[in-house]
């Protein structure tokens, strides 16, 4: 008894549908579907059975534009415009503000202003601004990651399958008679055949050539067409080990000049190709390319299958099922392609010539007719047998119907469970993909932060170099100031010695001055008693002329001294301004040192914050990976024993990774503790140094206070010397204060050097952290690979749970995996290009910095040369100043000698005066006259000697005036702010010598007056003595001769 659709009962229909013998899983499912098609069209089993064919067709159509989309790449701007509303990765809304190329990475980029502050910048990257926006709202991304609509749940392959199922259900509900039934059954049978062919003989499938990377890697041969890095195609020219790196490498000759060599690396040639066409890559990064038209046998099989399907479409409705079974029997053991291969082979089949198509159709019809005749004979035998068992069959029909209904209910229940299981697995897959995307975003953020830290590291290095240069300049200035302070201290000691000598000289001069004043008073008293000399006397005129000359010389000297004092005051003011400038520079250097301390402290705090941030990120990554692995474990708990074993391996791997992370964290914590201990020791050492410096400063202050007290207790007679000493002490105190400040600055500079060295150590630790982060990133990539493997295995579980949906899901997963792999490869290529650009920029910056350092070194050398020349000039001027001071000392010695001569003359004059008074008292009249004559002659001789002495003194005075003028001229030309105390001392000495000269001239004038008075007395006494005896005259003459002899 046949069904209304022409099918036989389920018990025997499958026996003739496959002549291969034991049916495969695909054939069994086809028999079930064939038996189920006889039921109602709206039953759930019929919907589920007819769904995959339409889903497979839909997937084949949807997969056609995939390669075109992959060829576009991330650099394709599309039709986006500035100001357009977009979504980044489907989740972050914003507005496009920039489209085009950038300097931080090659290719096309899109700058987007996000609605929320979840970005990375404010429109500027690497110091170059591309657009304006608030902070943390700007982001740069590839145009391929922009969409005009937000991403929705359940998109992708699931949506395609659901839409195909819905369309198939609608077509089933709206179908009519046998021709629509034929249109429904043929695609179903074709998909079942494809599934059975794939499960029976996987080696003939095209998916096995390009879907499994690991199998393709092992089958690489010379001459194969391959894909390198997801973007570069070429031909294999070398496979094996190399000298430049360990492991298996593949040498590829590219189609375009995008390579790096000509087949030779480091002097060793592996193959021959044009320059820039050769490329070496690890084997796991090379994918062999397979095309459907490369194998003639496969093409022939495809043509046969296409002819069979076209013949089925033209066969009558009554024999459609048997023709499907005949096609299955002829193709059951042959490999077939699904999806794109079936559609491509059907297109090729249409282009076959008419004669060949008709011959093959005729052969297929003959085989069909023979098979139908055999089936008719078998059916007749079965009907004969069935007539004898009609009663038994009628009794069993009700039981079979009940069993069939029960089987249908159980099948629907199982199918519902399978659907729920597939839905849960899909949801978990979406969650895992979201977690993976989130991890990728985190890794991108970390990479961007690492790049920013590298930029800030370069800025810090340049800043440290500048600070080192400043520290060197400060040290040089400190050395110069120390040398100047030592020289001033030596000058102060010399000044003290000179002040002691001057003090003794002043005491001697005061004693001599007191003696001379007494003698002058006596002489004045005698002159007043003797009366004034006549006005027409030549000696009086000479004395007046000498007095006028002396007054003019004193006025001229006063004028010169005022000019010299003005110049000295001017030089003192300039020196004071220079001291103020030095103080201002010192304060500036102190401020710079404080700023450097603050910067170093800030850098240390930032480094500590970065270390804590890296630790927290590593902990979060470890926890996220643990969660993802636990989720995978929960999803795969219901799998077979092999999957449980793999989950255990994954768990052991995760435990090993956790142990590695814990060890890294322990190492980082130990480093941190060690650094804190070192910081504490450095702080204690700096505190001790500061305390020692404070104690030394207190001792210096006490020492200088004691010296000031001693100098304040000096007598009032040395007021000028005290003023000079006080000025010198003030200057020395200022210099010592500057010395103390410079010592503090030197200590601060040492502290800054230590801090800079610590910062460099911390930068090295930071680089080690970066390396650890890179290792953790590699571990994350390994975990992602494991995750991808787990996803593939999950897909295998899905295929086991639902064999009907396995091909569609697997093809979708493969296409998504290909796209994902291409995106990751392109992202890695972009990152590599970005790193290359960053390396080039850093090298250019290093060259610029080296040029600046060389220029600064040249400037420093020229400055040192200038300083040496100035020091030589200064030494020469100091030598000339010392020579002038020696000459002044010699002049002062001559003055002392002159004063001694004057004293000797005055003493001889006093002796003569005493002798004259005694002679006047004791001698009587004529003898007194004779003695007076004798004394008159003696006085004339002594007067002549005194005139000669006065003339010699005048000549010496003129010579001293000339020397004084010359020394003043030299002093005007060689004056220096550092020799100000010596200049003051010489000025005071010059004034004192001028006073001594004035006193000597006054004494000479008084002596001349006294001589004139004695001459007048002798003239008056000459008139009194008119006569005298010859003996008396002869005796005085003899006495005079004897005196002359003596």
Swiss-Prot record:
Which intervals of the chain form a coiled coil?
A: 355-525, 564-637, 675-966, 994-1014
Q: Where is the composition biased (Basic and acidic residues)?
A: 1035-1046
Q: Where is the composition biased (Low complexity)?
A: 26-39, 315-339
In Gene Ontology terms, what is a biological process of this protein? cytoplasmic microtubule organization
- Sequence ranges of Polar residues compositional bias: 50-62, 196-211, 1021-1032
Q: Which segments carry the region annotation Disordered?
A: 1-72, 196-216, 314-340, 1021-1046
Q: Which cysteines are joined by disulfide bonds?
A: none
Q: Which residues form the CAP-Gly domain?
A: 100-142, 240-282
- Residues of the signal peptide: none
**Cellular compartments annotated:** Cytoplasm; Cytoplasm, Cytoskeleton
* Record flagged with keyword Transferase: no
Q: List the PROSITE patterns hit by this protein, alphabetically.
A: CAP_GLY_1, CAP_GLY_2
Alphabetized GO MF terms:
microtubule binding; microtubule plus-end binding
Identify residues that carry Phosphoserine.
50, 203, 208, 212, 315, 923, 973, 979
Q: Name one GO cellular component term.
A: lamellar body
Q: Which UniProt keywords apply?
A: Coiled coil, Cytoplasm, Cytoskeleton, Microtubule, Phosphoprotein, Repeat
An example of a Pfam family matching this protein is: CAP_GLY
Chief place where the protein resides: cytoplasm
Q: Which InterPro entries match?
A: CAP-Gly_dom_sf, CAP-Gly_domain
Q: How does it assemble?
A: Interacts with CLASP1 and CLASP2. Binds preferentially to tyrosinated microtubules, and only marginally to detyrosinated microtubules.
Explain the purpose of this protein. Answer: Seems to link microtubules to dendritic lamellar body (DLB), a membranous organelle predominantly present in bulbous dendritic appendages of neurons linked by dendrodendritic gap junctions. May operate in the control of brain-specific organelle translocations.
Q: What is this protein called?
A: CAP-Gly domain-containing linker protein 2
Query: Which organism does this record belong to?
Result: Rattus norvegicus
Lineage of the species this protein comes from? Eukaryota, Metazoa, Chordata, Craniata, Vertebrata
